């Protein structure tokens, strides 16, 4: 089913509240949902939930004092974050829309410095920095696509790797178009500028990169709605189904690569009962084994 995405003419979630609570307000009695150290280990970033709000807090690791962060408008929430370098973080919002009981993402990426300065919407439908009524074009346009990050690119302090799932216009709105190839781009986390890396030929592709930021595996959906996975040893090589490359089941989903880059974790059915579990496949030694065995259920 194609989900219609109406154009949202609303104030961005980056806007400040009229009377925002200080970030220290969320430090006491909060539930910490995610915690991550900065690359140097000197700072701690965390999503904190208190009284229905989810904010991003940055603390000094030694003193535990709040030194920065950001909080969205009252009904929105910080849904994920990642350190890009020692000073800047990339994050996503989950927004509360009228008539909905649940927050949902608009497929947009944001960035902010650890101290809360220089917040910006980097990529997504509303990421244009063009100004209404101006004769001068902006330096970037909004993406007619849903955007998500696929690699932090640890050796590059200024860029991350993203994937864009294009929309098509339907009347006054836009909807996801599964016929258009997903676009992989390198995104500058300071300027928002993008450079296309490649276009994947797979529908609803979920790519997986190695430690060098190269896409090696991809899981995708066929026109029949089936999940398949493919592999390539490098960018110049052709994609191969898992059955052709390693004699594995094609309906396994790719979960992640190990740090060494010589083994992949896969998710799929196991045993006569068909309980789904995680497998580890060493594609250099050709060893394939489940991580969890003796699976059972009493439902």
Regions found by a protein language model. Give the residues of each.
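Beta-propeller folds
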Residues: 18-299
